[in-house]
Curated annotation (Swiss-Prot):
The keyword Magnesium does not apply. This is Biosynthetic peptidoglycan transglycosylase. Its EC number is 2.4.99.28. Belongs to the glycosyltransferase 51 family. The keyword Nucleus does not apply. GO terms for biological process: cell wall organization; peptidoglycan biosynthetic process; regulation of cell shape.
Length: 225
């Protein structure tokens, strides 16, 4: 029985190490190559293979600065200054989770969200949060802030099977993300808490309020050069 437990434990440890190796090697490759698919995209495709994934890569310099400012105003105003983790946000999330007795808030930065989108799944759990932390730590040490934001903008979800700001700009406005106005950029950034719902509820009061807040603060955010 003891030998069996040891074997199971070794298999478990080996599996964890293989996952870390997969994440590490993927991050090495994506330092210089476009990210053409993510775990979130795969999950969407597996759930309904008849629905195509809409995704188009756009280089950092070809994305409107309006959107860069808007996405950071909405998701991670301290992005340029932290090393992957916003400890004030995490502290607030822990307090809320303790109050509720379950994971209801994440306090996630752009880097953490990207790690989740690339490698993990959406269901909240402490195990997923732990793996997200490891992947974020690796990413922040291997990629520049510019690269992290570039990949994030190209892989984040904006609606059902709709990924990346270029696909979103074409879908919502019939134009490239290169020419998004402040209003348009703020609207797209405001979608992110619940893009599949807001896709069909564009006049939702919470969405419109969030858009106004982003417009108010987007000029104060600092973006990577």
């Amino acid at each position: 029985m003891k030998a069996f437990i040891v074997r199971v434990l070794l298999i478990f440890i080996g599996a964890i190490l293989l996952i870390q190796l997969w994440i590490f090697s993927s991050l090495v490759w994506w330092r210089t190559h476009e990210v053409d698919t993510t775990m979130f995209m795969r999950i969407d495709y597996w759930s309904d293979p008849s629905e195509p994934i809409i995704h188009e890569w756009l280089d950092y310099d070809d994305i409107s600065d309006n959107f860069k400012h808007a996405i950071l105003a909405g998701e991670d105003a301290k992005f340029i200054h932290h090393h992957g983790f916003d400890w004030d946000g995490i502290r607030f999330a822990l307090e809320r989770n303790n109050e509720q007795g379950e994971v209801v808030a994440g306090g996630s930065t752009v880097s953490q969200q990207l790690a989740k989108n690339l490698f993990l799944y959406n269901k909240r759990s402490f195990i997923r949060k732990g793996q997200e932390t490891v992947a974020t730590w690796m990413m922040e040490r291997m990629w520049s802030k510019r690269r992290i934001l570039e990949v994030y903008m190209n892989s984040v979800e904006f609606g059902k099977n709709l990924y990346g700001v270029e696909a979103a700009a074409q879908y919502y406005y019939g134009k490239s993300a290169k020419s998004l106005t402040r209003e348009q950029a703020a609207f797209l950034a405001a979608l992110l808490p619940d893009p599949k719902y807001y896709q069909d509820h564009r006049n939702d009061r919470k969405l419109q309020y969030r858009k106004r807040v982003i417009l108010r603060y987007m000029n104060s955010t600092q973006i990577p050069e």
